[in-house]
């Protein structure tokens, strides 16, 4: 898994400035909450999940469709009409494949960050 500085560099080049600032804020808040309620391992996981939760959000629609097909991510009729809804599921795959995340807790946090589980 990439270290947080390398992740930030990569995200800065792939996200809009607004999304990047949002991402840094989410990681910061996730870190604060994890410090309050968990141990150092939870803090680390929370920061990674916070940084990567929207890693696929700014992908163009056609790219999202292509990657969903390539990564075998199910896309229902509602998602087909509103392709941005795939971003948490696609984001988990991108985190795994492009950022080297193997920890299932982090991947699940990314996958379910819009709806919870």
Q: What annotation goes with each model-predicted range?
A:
Residues 19:
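Short glycine/threonine-rich catalytic loop with a Thr-x-Gly-x-Asp
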């Amino acid at each position: 898994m990439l270290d947080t500085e390398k992740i930030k560099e990569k995200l800065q080049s792939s996200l809009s400035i607004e999304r990047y600032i949002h991402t840094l804020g989410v990681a910061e808040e996730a870190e604060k909450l994890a410090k309050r309620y968990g141990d150092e391992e939870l803090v680390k996981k929370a920061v990674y999940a916070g940084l990567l939760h929207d890693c696929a959000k700014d992908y163009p629609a056609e790219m999202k469709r292509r990657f969903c097909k390539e990564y075998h991510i199910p896309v229902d009729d509602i998602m087909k009409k509103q392709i941005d809804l795939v971003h948490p599921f696609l984001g988990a795959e991108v985190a795994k494949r492009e950022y080297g995340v193997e920890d299932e807790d982090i991947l699940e946090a990314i996958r379910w960050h819009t709806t919870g589980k």
